[in-house]
Amino acid sequence: YVGEVGGNLSGGYNNDKTARYADQFGLGVALDLQKLWGWDNTQAKIQLTNRNGQNISNDRIGDPRAGTLSSSQEVYGRGHMVRLTQFWIQHQMFDNKLDVKLGYFGEGEDFNTFPCDFQNLSFCGSQVGNYVSTWYNWPVAQAAIRVKYHITPELYAQIGAYNQNPSQLEHGNGFKLSGSGTKGTVIPVEL
């Protein structure tokens, strides 16, 4: 569970003093498939999320007619609904140098990662996903594969392929696993 309060004490588009609360409930399981079924170096994860509340940036900080560039509460967004956020299997081979992940997950989980140490969206999560309309961050998952190779313990190269499907953003499509609505594929590369 994550809950965030954002307040407007002075200034902004609407300078009335007020606060807004947004939250996210999560339920998930991480599985070590080596311990469960004897599959060497294999893990799986399933995560559901549900977001609720209001964002102080939408009507108090920024002008609602123009929209805002970022959010004061990172946990707000992508609809008030239950979503399948992670549903993947991951396997390491060749002395853990090669790591392959396949399933449903977002680009920001593995590419352009950034810790979330403060509730403002500008300081949280994959920044590409916060500002580019074709890159979906948590809690939106899409069909994906990511292949990472560790060149040295400190250096890796990775490539991914993510189904770019705007219909997954629509209300009621939190568990959509079909490819209908697909516009293409996002292929990030990172060193």
Please annotate each region the language model reported.
Residues G28-A30, Q43-Q47, W88-Q90, D99-G103:
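Short, conserved beta-strand segments within well-ordered enzyme catalytic domains
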Residues G7-D23, W37-Q86, L177-G179:
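Surface-exposed loop and membrane-interface regions of Gram-negative outer-membrane beta-barrel proteins
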Residues L31-A44, F94-K97, E154-A157:
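Short loop/turn motifs that connect adjacent beta-strands in outer-membrane beta-barrel proteins
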Residues F25-L33, V189-L191:
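Short, well-ordered amphipathic alpha-helices
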Residues G3-G7, L48-Q54, Y104-G108, A161-N165:
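Transmembrane beta-strands of outer-membrane beta-barrel pores
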Residues D23-F25, T42, A141, T185:
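Residues at beta-strand starts and edge strands
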